[in-house]
Amino acid sequence: MNGNDNLSTRAYLAIGMMLFALFFGAGNLIFPAALGQQAGSNVGWALFGFVLTGVGLPLLGVAAMGYSSCKDVEELASRVHPIYGLLYTISLYLSIGPMFATPRTGTVAYEIAIKPFTEGLSMNMEPIFLALFFGVSLWLSISPHKLVNRIGNILTPALLLVILLLIIKSFMTPLVGYAVPQPAYGDAPTAVLQGFLDGYNTMDALASVVFAILVIDFVRLSGATSHAVVTKTVMEVGAIAVALLGIVYVFIANIGATSVERFGLFDTGAPVLSVSANYLFGGFGQIILAIIVLLACLSTSIGLITSCGTYFHKLTPKISYKLYVVIFSVAAFGLSMFGLKTIISAAIPVLMLLYPLTIVIVLLALLHNVFGGRRCVYAWTMAFTMISALMTGLETAGIAPATLEQLFTQYIPFQAAGMGWVSFAVLGFIVGLIHKGLVSENK
């Protein structure tokens, strides 16, 4: 460490690769592959939208946490109101924790890495594997201070090496041509929009504001002290992580886009990867893919359990961190038994609610100094965003009141596409600025 408390190159890379590995889990494997299959020859346009939410927003999330000087997500969200901050943060952690994202890591690991090797057995191996998977996740989550060494220095290099092998082979043995796009990706504008919404499924923007706290802690432990250096370093290691994510997304989506004519369409991205790896490498391909999936899903599972345990222990200190880790690991195991397709379907309405709220709070954090950090601007913007996001979530779940749904779809720009929250957020921001101006004039 030198005198101006900058990190060493090794520390930069270790923390950057740790963050990549925390992001790169179940959804980052299956959703680009599924997007590629659906988008076909429009995969480039769909990827553009997907990268905005799957790469751009996570980077903004990490940057916002570093820039804001907030010690956690709740403190940032409490700029709206303390009660909102608490409820939003609990919802966020439960979604990326035991309810959806963490169980998904186990189910994807089983579907891709284990199931192809056990299909001939009379015994159902899924419960046994999931118990082992979350047992290992629990064990490795007990000591969070060892996360950089275990993931950044060990798991991530191994993961990247095996992914690189798959990418090189996909160039040497290309699949057939690009498929005809499905209707949702039929032209460039719709493909970009659908890709943007598909990026919600990775949950990386939600996780970014959580993982950023881990990164900030590790940056400080590595020797950085001043706020300026911590912010700069967090953004740089975030850039390393999302650049790696973007590169991998491009190649996985391309494999999906060129796999349809040979293998047909699949319900999820899991079998796309499985049959493609088998085609590229033969029987050995399934082993390579199994290693990628196990490493990716395990590292993400550890990061999510660690983050959730840390937050809830802080919220209720009388319950130990280790007990919370046990609770979340057991809960994730139980919910993972419902299967991958059920978990994905159940998560979508919640994501349609939480994603707009997260995007807007991140943007407000980055614009904090522009409007003087006034609470009225935060409150009005988030209140308006909540109206549309809640309606979209209800629509996606199929429980929205028919009259309201018709009104929103007819009069709110992009509401039918799940993007009506943009208009509401802008309107709320303007109202907040007017409120700020009126209050200032009356002083």
Question: Whereabouts are the PLM-identified features?
Answer:
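Hydrophobic, membrane-embedded alpha-helices of multi-pass small-molecule transporters
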Residues: 13-24, 168-176, 185-252, 288-297, ...
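Selective recognition of specific alpha-helical transmembrane segments in multi-pass small-molecule
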Residues: 56, 60, 158-170, 234-260, ...
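Membrane-water interface regions at transmembrane-helix termini and the short interhelical loops
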Residues: 67-75, 134-155, 221-224, 333-346, ...
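TM-loop-TM module centered on a large, flexible mid-protein loop between adjacent transmembrane helices
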Residues: 72-78, 248-298, 305, 349
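Hydrophobic alpha-helical segments and their helix-loop junctions in multi-pass secondary transporters
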Residues: 98, 102, 160-187, 205-206, ...
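Membrane-interface loop-to-helix entry segments
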Residues: 142-170, 348-359, 378-388
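Hydrophobic, small-residue-rich membrane helices and short re-entrant helix-turn-helix hairpins
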Residues: 143-154, 192-195, 215-244, 261-274, ...
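A generic transmembrane alpha-helix motif of multi-pass inner-membrane proteins
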Residues: 173, 374-443
